[in-house]
Amino acid sequence: MALIRLELHEHPASPQHEMRQKSVLDSGGTVVGTVANLYVDEGSRQLRFVDVLTSEFLGLERKHHLVPVEAVSDQDPGSITLGVDQETVQSGPEFPNPHVAPDEDYQRTIREHYGYG
C-alpha cells in the first residue's frame, strides 16, 4: 500500500491516532522512546505505522524503528503503550530515512517482525 509521512500540520483520519511527541512504553511499562512520525495510507489517511525514535546504548545512540499501529495496545494523553517488549522494538530493522515513506517490501518486513505478516 502507498504510504505518506504526515507533516506536522497534517493529521491522521482518526483524531485518536494523533500520537506525535508522546512517550512510547513497552508492554512492561519501560520507556522505549518517543513517537517521531506517523505514516498513513495515502488514500484513506488511516494510520498504518508509528515511527519510534529510540535511545539505545546509554541514550547516546538514537534510532528510528517503525511499529505497526496494531502493536499499540493503549494510549493516554502523554504516552502510548505497545503490546511488545523493548527488545522486540530495538531488534527490529532500523528505519534509515524517516523523511521518506517506507516501500512495500520494508512494510512487509516490519509487519512480519511484529507478527502481523
Which residues does each PLM region occupy?
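Peripheral interaction segments used for macromolecular assembly
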Residues: M1-G117
